[in-house]
Amino acid sequence: MAKAPIRARKRVRKTVSDGVAHIHASFNNTIVTITDRQGNALGWATAGGSGFRGSRKSTPFAAQVAAERCAEAVKEYGIKNLEVMVKGPGPGRESTIRALNAAGFRITNITDVTPIPHNGCRPPKKRRV
C-alpha cells in the first residue's frame, strides 16, 4: 500500500513589537534570552556557545558577542522595544546591554532581578588561591 506524501507544515512567524531580554551574568558565563511579554522564548545565545571557552567565556567581550548573536536570532520577529532584566554579578552585565542597544533595539527600562537571600543558605567558603 502506498503511503501518502508527507507535507511539511508552514511555520507561521509571529510578529512581536515588544520583548524582554533576560540576561543571566554569572562569574563563568553569560546567557542572553529574548522572550515576548508572556515569557515565551524567541531566541537565546550564550558566551560559551559563541565560541568562547575557559576563562575567555567570562569576559565582557564574550557577553557582547552573545548579545549580538541573540539579537540576530530574533530580528525576524520584528522586535523594536526591549525591556532588560539583569540577573547575577558577572562581568557581562553592562556590555550585554550596550550590545543590545547597538543592535537597534530601543531599551525601555532596565531591571535588576538578582536574587538576594534574606539570610538563607550559607554561602560557599572563601577561595584560597
Swiss-Prot record:
GO terms for cellular component: ribonucleoprotein complex; ribosome. The lineage of its organism: Bacteria, Pseudomonadati, Pseudomonadota, Gammaproteobacteria, Enterobacterales. It comes from the Bacteria. The gene is rpsK. Located on the platform of the 30S subunit, it bridges several disparate RNA helices of the 16S rRNA. Forms part of the Shine-Dalgarno cleft in the 70S ribosome. This is Small ribosomal subunit protein uS11. Pfam families: Ribosomal_S11 (PF00411). The keyword Ribonucleoprotein applies. InterPro entries: Ribosomal_uS11, Ribosomal_uS11_bac-type, Ribosomal_uS11_CS, Ribosomal_uS11_sf. HAMAP family: Ribosomal_uS11 (MF_01310). Keywords: Ribonucleoprotein, Ribosomal protein, RNA-binding, rRNA-binding. Belongs to the universal ribosomal protein uS11 family. GO terms for biological process: translation. It comes from Yersinia pestis (strain Pestoides F).
